[in-house]
């Protein structure tokens, strides 16, 4: 029987059928061929081209199914992004729009057997926000387009620049502290040299004393010669009896002494030196204590400045474990359940992936709580002076609702914070 004419009703009906969606059971995904009836599908399965495609499938079935699954996922998300980008819509509506294209990848050739299984996969992978309602599954596309990626990149760049500025200021303050400590050590060493009993002052004092005694001897000799020239022998005898002193600069005290008065003067001078050394030592100690107190005050002021600059009214950050406390989500079983912050939106809203169900929720930070790990666990400091640093939990004070942590890595590596509030630290997800 020949073909129908171009404008006959039968030819028109055939063209309409060719454009529309035929029965799913008569479609061959490997050959991407739609048959109109059972007889045509049977003939296609017996064809040589179909047999070759089935041999290819038999060599690597998992790879073929995975390829069809990726194509199905990409096409479905493309349709959802273009048609329902910012709306909450039923999954069946989107699926019906998707299969309206006769060249779409059929679901029975993918690794998902049902639409419900595919929707759960979208929620687990974070492609969509998934809600199970009495009317069925509803999905909302999570927009991760280039515009938001650019905004996130600019935000990360701004945060890095702020952190770099803070690190520069902290290095400058650390250098100032080192210089202050070095100057304190130098002043202490100079004061110790001045107060030592074997110093230059003792040597100069003995030399002056020797010169005075020598001048006195010369004056006495000249007077004796002018008064009585005949008594020269007596003067010579006196000079021999009282010889001039031999000065050794290493000796502490002069060896020449003239009676008890000079001994008293020497002892008084020694006492004055000791008192002066003690006074200088006390002054040095007081000066060192004053410098230390000034240094402590400087460090406290710097700590307060960091606290003021890093204390914010938002604390969410990716990678931490939080507890959902929203009463509106209690009916769905999410209340008091833990999840991981995957992304932060506008500083105050977080995308939370629940640990048990793997569902992705958007929750405000007011309806979230921080999670404290066991002793020895890693935490992130989410607010306060050391915001953004990782630390290890050392102990917990349940009466004061605070914890003791030790900062790890970074500029403050090894610093111990003795009392940090529960709200300022949160468990890190491993």
Curated annotation (Swiss-Prot):
A zinc finger (C2H2-type) spans 28-50. Residues 147-183, 283-312 form a coiled coil. Residues 209-224 have a biased composition (Acidic residues). Residues 376-427 are annotated as: C-terminal subdomain B. A motif (Nuclear localization signal (NLS)) lies at residues 155-158. Residues 261-278 have a biased composition (Basic and acidic residues). It is found in: Nucleus. Residues 51-160 are annotated as: Winged helix-turn-helix (wHTH). Residues 179-230, 261-284 are annotated as: Disordered. Residues 319-370 are annotated as: C-terminal subdomain A. One of its GO terms (molecular function) is double-stranded DNA binding. Keywords: Coiled coil, Metal-binding, Nucleus, Zinc, Zinc-finger. It comes from Oryza sativa subsp. indica. SUPFAM superfamilies: beta-beta-alpha zinc fingers (SSF57667). This is KIN17-like protein. GO terms for biological process: DNA damage response; DNA replication. Belongs to the KIN17 family. GO terms for cellular component: nucleus. Its main location: nucleus.
């Amino acid at each position: 029987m020949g073909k129908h004419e171009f404008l006959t009703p039968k030819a028109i009906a055939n063209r309409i059928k060719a454009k529309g969606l035929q029965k799913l059971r008569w479609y061959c995904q490997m050959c991407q061929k739609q048959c109109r009836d059972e007889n045509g599908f049977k003939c296609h399965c017996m064809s040589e081209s179909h047999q070759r495609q089935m041999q290819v499938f038999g060599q690597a079935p998992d790879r073929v199914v995975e390829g069809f699954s990726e194509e199905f996922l990409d096409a479905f998300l493309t349709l959802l992004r273009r048609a329902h980008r910012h709306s909450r819509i039923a999954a069946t509506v989107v699926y019906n729009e998707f299969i309206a294209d006769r060249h779409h990848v059929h679901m029975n050739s993918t690794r998902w057997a049902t639409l419900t299984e595919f929707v759960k996969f979208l929620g687990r992978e974070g492609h969509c926000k998934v809600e199970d309602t009495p009317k069925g599954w509803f999905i909302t596309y999570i927009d991760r387009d280039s515009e938001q990626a650019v905004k996130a990149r600019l935000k990360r760049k701004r945060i890095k620049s702020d952190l770099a500025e803070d690190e520069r200021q902290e290095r400058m303050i650390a250098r100032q502290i080192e210089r202050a400590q070095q100057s304190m050590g130098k002043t202490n060493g100079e004061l110790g040299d001045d107060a030592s009993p074997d110093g230059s002052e003792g040597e100069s004092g003995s030399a002056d004393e020797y010169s005075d005694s020598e001048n006195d001897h010369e004056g006495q000799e000249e007077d004796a010669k002018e008064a009585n020239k005949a008594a020269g022998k007596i003067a010579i005898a006196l000079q021999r009896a009282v010889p001039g002193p031999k000065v050794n600069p290493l000796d502490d005290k002069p060896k020449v002494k003239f009676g008890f008065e000079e001994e008293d003067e020497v002892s008084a001078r020694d006492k004055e030196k000791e008192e002066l050394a003690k006074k200088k030592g006390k002054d040095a100690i007081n000066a060192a204590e004053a410098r230390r107190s000034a240094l402590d005050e400087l460090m406290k002021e710097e700590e307060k400045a960091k606290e003021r600059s890093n204390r914010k009214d938002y604390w969410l950050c990716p990678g931490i474990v939080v507890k959902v406390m929203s009463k509106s989500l209690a009916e769905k079983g999410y209340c008091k359940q833990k999840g991981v912050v995957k992304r932060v939106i506008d500083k105050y809203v977080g995308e939370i992936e629940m640990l048990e169900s793997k569902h992705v929720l958007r929750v405000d930070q007011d309806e979230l709580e921080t999670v404290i790990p066991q002793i020895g666990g890693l935490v992130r400091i989410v607010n306060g002076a050391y915001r953004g640093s990782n630390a290890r939990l050392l102990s917990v004070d349940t009466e004061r609702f605070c914890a003791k942590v030790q900062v790890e890595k970074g500029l403050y590596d090894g610093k111990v914070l003795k009392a940090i509030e529960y709200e300022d630290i949160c468990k890190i997800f491993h």
